[in-house]
Amino acid sequence: MIRTVSSGIFVCGLSILAGCAGMQETNKINGTRYLETETGRWLVHDMNRPAPPVITPGTQSTQKQAGKAPSDAIVLFDGTDLSEWTTIKGGPAKWTVRDGYMRVVKKTGDIKTKQSFGSCQLHIEFATPSRVTRKSQERGNSGVFLMSTYEVQVLDSYENQTYPDGQCAALYGRAVPLVNACRKPGQWQSYDIIFHRPIFKGNKVVRKATFTVFHNGVLVQDHVVLQGGTDWIDEHTVTNYSPHEDKLPLMLQDHDNPVRYRNIWVRELKDK
């Protein structure tokens, strides 16, 4: 909608007419005429302002088939092999791959990406075992670790009672999800995660990490400021922040449960 606002414009001389007129109009109508941005100072609706790049959006997954990543994403797993992954020590990842997914192999250890990431958008899909034999934290347990450090819990939380900060979509030991959006055991589920890394100055954290998480399309972590680490120390203790590199690998956890993963991709984000 375009709305016309009538206001007087003081003429200050030809050389500064535009700037002065803009200043008076801003003051008169209590509005904004110029915007200070990362790419410079721009007039509102300025056609010379840089346009965003054009990409091809991805496609949605179904229970039977994984979707496709957007064209500007870094694909970490497309269902064919583990060429983008290693063990924690850097050896070949030993999880199995079949029918378009990877599956945790008990006692083979966590796996990590060969590439390192900081702030990012992450899409990942998972399925806990369809056959339920355990309860609480022993039921479909795994984890998605941003920067190999900050965990979004993976767990079968469908009709499965456990401590709230350890259920599915929790920031482990730190933040309880807004709702329990779990599907039934064996069904494919998704996380869409917006993560901004912590920033350190020496041994001090000067900006804490933030998480926004959608679980099966439902907002469950709303720009949560992570108050510290998520590594388990004992029953009632998790770690504090510890300085680390600006970029680190993504890690998936082997918690002795045959959890499956598919359609994993990431888009790197600029630090603000």
Language model features: what each stretch is:
Residues M1-C12:
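Bacterial N-terminal signal peptides that target proteins for export
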Residues C20-K272:
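Carbohydrate-interacting regions of secretory-pathway proteins
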